[in-house]
Amino acid sequence: GYDNKKATDNAIKLHSDGKKWLHTGDIGYMTEDGTIYALTRGEAPRYGGGSLATLPMENRLADAEVEGIDDEFFVIVQDPEHHRCFLPYLFVVLEEGYTVDDIREKVNESLEDYMQPVDIIALPERPFFHFKTNRIGLIHDIEAGKFNK
């Protein structure tokens, strides 16, 4: 954390080679030529079991080819009831004539129990900020109750 010494000390660690390394918690890999690929942003455990990661969840859902979904992506939000645990929300852009109720059963059948979204929210289009999906904006919207029914 920028203004949190304890969080900074936990993230920046001195290794046995004498160099300081930043431990972000991100998950990825480096190829032999030194190219780094980030797959997901750290660990996000779900209360009751399972570790949430948007990319594998989105890939599984895309592979299921759920009829009625034009685009889908997950947002992972802190669980307000369980410290250090998270909840998945699924955002979808639906094909014309479909509703969230039309896709819900197939979505849930396509995902492991721990991956199943606490809510499926339809949007007219995927929101972007600086050419990336605006997950942070959606997290703020979820936390503010914008999508509460």
Task: List the predicted regions and their residue ranges.
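AMP-binding/adenylate-forming catalytic core of the ANL superfamily
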Residues: 1, 9-115
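Acidic/polar helix N-cap motif
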Residues: 4-8, 134
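Conserved C-terminal "lid"/linker of ANL adenylate-forming enzymes
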Residues: 78, 89-91, 103-149
